[in-house]
Amino acid sequence: MAQHQVNYASNAGLPVALTTVDKLVNWGRTNSLWVLTYGLACCAIEMMASGASRYDFDRFGVIFRASPRQSDVMIVAGTLTKKHAEFIRRLYDQMAEPKWVISMGSCANTGGMFNTYATVQGVDRVIPVDIYLPGCAPRPETLQYAVMLLQKKLRKRSIFQKQKPKRLV
C-alpha cells in the first residue's frame, strides 16, 4: 500500500484532509482494478487460481469482470491466433481510458512454441502491452507481482498529462 502524507487543517473545528487531485485519483485507480480476463490456454488456469482463496486477488482490489466496458486492465493468457486477433482488438477498443494490458505467459508474449501461419507471434502485435509475464505457465504469485508493479506505475501517473506507454517488465 502507498503511504502518502496527508495534511490535516483545522477548519472551524472540523478536520479537513488536504491532498492533490493526482494522489486522490491514483489512489482510487490503484485500489480498484477491474480486470477483463482473456484466457486462451493453460495460463488461464493459473489466472483462475490467482482469484481463488489461496492467493485472493480481492485483497489487492482486483475484481474480475466479464464486460470490457467495466474493465481497466486486460490480462491475455495463452496463444493468440489470427482469428482471435480481430476480436481481442475489438475488446481492447471497447475498454474505457485509461486502460492497461498484461501479457501472461510465453505464448502470449512471443507465440511460444507455435510458430505457424495461424499464430500471432505476441499480443503486442495487436494491442499495446504494459507488462509481460514470462514463463509457461507463470505462477499466480508472478501475476500478483505484475499487478503490484502496475499499481506502482499508477501511483506515479499524472492524470493531466498524456503519457507514453512504458514497458515495465
UniProtKB/Swiss-Prot annotation:
Keywords: 4Fe-4S, Cell inner membrane, Cell membrane, Iron, Iron-sulfur, Membrane, Metal-binding, NAD, Quinone, Translocase, Transport, Ubiquinone. It is a peripheral membrane protein. Binds 1 [4Fe-4S] cluster. One of its GO terms (cellular component) is respiratory chain complex I. Its EC number is 7.1.1.-. Its main location: membrane. InterPro entries: NADH_UbQ_OxRdtase-like_20kDa (IPR006137), NADH_UQ_OxRdtase_20Kd_su (IPR006138). One of its GO terms (molecular function) is quinone binding. It catalyses: a quinone + NADH + 5 H(+)(in) = a quinol + NAD(+) + 4 H(+)(out). One of its GO terms (biological process) is electron transport coupled proton transport. It holds the Pfam family Oxidored_q6. [4Fe-4S] cluster binds at C42, C43, C107, C136. It is found in: Cell inner membrane. Its cofactor is [4Fe-4S] cluster. The keyword NADP does not apply. Belongs to the complex I 20 kDa subunit family. NDH-1 is composed of 14 different subunits. Subunits NuoB, C, D, E, F, and G constitute the peripheral sector of the complex. NDH-1 shuttles electrons from NADH, via FMN and iron-sulfur (Fe-S) centers, to quinones in the respiratory chain. The immediate electron acceptor for the enzyme in this species is believed to be ubiquinone. Couples the redox reaction to proton translocation (for every two electrons transferred, four hydrogen ions are translocated across the cytoplasmic membrane), and thus conserves the redox energy in a proton gradient. HAMAP family: NDH1_NuoB. This is NADH-quinone oxidoreductase subunit B.
